[in-house]
Amino acid sequence: MSEDIRRGPGRPPKKRVVPNFERKGILEKPVRPQSRLEFSYDNPLIFKNLFIYFKNLKSKNILVRCTPTEITFFSRDQSQASFVIATIDGKNVNHYYASDVFWLGINRELVEKMFNSIDRSFLKITIVHRYDKPETLFFIFTDFDIDKECTYHITVSEPELDMDLIEMEKSISEERLKNYPLRWEFTSKQLKKTFSDLSNYTELVTIEKLGGDTPLHLYFQKFNSISYHEMYKSSNKINLTSTIPKSQVFQINVKIAHIKSLASAMVTDKIRILCEENGNLIFQSEMDALMLNTITLNNMI
């Protein structure tokens, strides 16, 4: 059968020409003189995925911190056991400007509806906050194929800061992250399956590793009932690393319900998991310029 017959009648699909956007990073002054914040980025779907994650976690209000170098989103999940901190470094976007450090409060459900209408036809998002309209955040989406701009005016507020949530940022500082004794990577599918399967039998699971080049273990045991043991023998397959001394054992117990809800909410394929001695867990993932951190506290079990 010829290629023409296989293709069928009609014109071949038109190849989409994608503009080449330069990522200039941080600007010394805004493009628009009235701007307190300007953020221009050629990957709007990153924001859509971020707010899908907030929705999956049933987050309510979101704190937004703008600084001269980055924009950060803070929120909690419905259980209040997990804290979400998502940061975009201004140097990794098309252009970024913020005059100073300031906070905005936005309603997740309101912004989520806006992002639900955004598809792949929109190739750029621009976010603007102006001195003359401090109660409004402008979201501008651009479709270059038909030269269309869609602008949303979202009401924002000067929020009451959640200091316990903001304090969690110390857990993901560069210096602190160096000291986590155990870390590995799962795909979102692996994470979801492991904790979904475990939830059928137990509320707590033990994460354990001996010092040195040894496997990672996840297990539980119910006396006179059932036990289960999951072992990861090849450290390279899950990018397993640790700083545990050879003579020591790292062991923590975590509540499965917290991890299961996070696993079901994930919007990235790869998740890096970091463990502290006190049982706190950090789930890290990246989406282009966005670094997404979710901290689950063991003392909330």
Swiss-Prot record:
Keywords: Host-virus interaction, Inhibition of host innate immune response by virus, Inhibition of host IRF3 by virus, Inhibition of host RLR pathway by virus, Late protein, Viral immunoevasion. Signal peptide: none annotated. It comes from the Viruses. InterPro entries: DNA_clamp_sf. GO terms for biological process: symbiont-mediated suppression of host cytoplasmic pattern recognition receptor signaling pathway via inhibition of IRF3 activity. The keyword Methyltransferase does not apply. Induction: Expressed in the late phase of the viral replicative cycle. Plays a role in the inhibition of host innate immune system by acting as a negatively regulator of type I interferon production. Mechanistically, interacts with and prevents host IRF3 nuclear localization to inhibit its transcriptional activity. Interacts with host IRF3. Belongs to the asfivirus E301R family. This is Uncharacterized protein E301R. It comes from African swine fever virus (isolate Tick/South Africa/Pretoriuskop Pr4/1996).
